[in-house]
Amino acid sequence: LPLIEDAAQAFGATWRGARIGTFGALAAFSLQQGKHITTGEGGIVATDDDALARRLFLFVNKAWGYGDPKPDHYFPAPNYRLTELQGAVALAQLPKLDQVVAARRD
């Protein structure tokens, strides 16, 4: 049974010396406005499994296989892509993550 981690508010957290988001097959982090890193809404799913990563990419992208020789909608799926602006906003906050976590702990 694969483990899916709900790591919504766990950016930077550790358990028994390992970072949260590294235990399961998938880990979901939230970017909603009250979280450690925010883009207003949305989230990030992390995995180190190439097959799952491909399935996730297709799922959040209406199952449209961009870059495939014959792109098609492979299965019914929504559009959950972050915008490029949301991605840039999230990336700009990463260097400040340790400070944000420390401030929340105080």
Provide a role label for each language-model segment:
Residues 1:
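A short helix->loop->beta-strand "cap" motif at the edges of active sites that frequently abuts
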Residues 6:
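Glycine-centered flexible beta-alpha turn that most often forms the glycine-rich phosphate-binding loop
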Residues 10-16, 23-106:
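Active-site region of PLP-dependent enzymes
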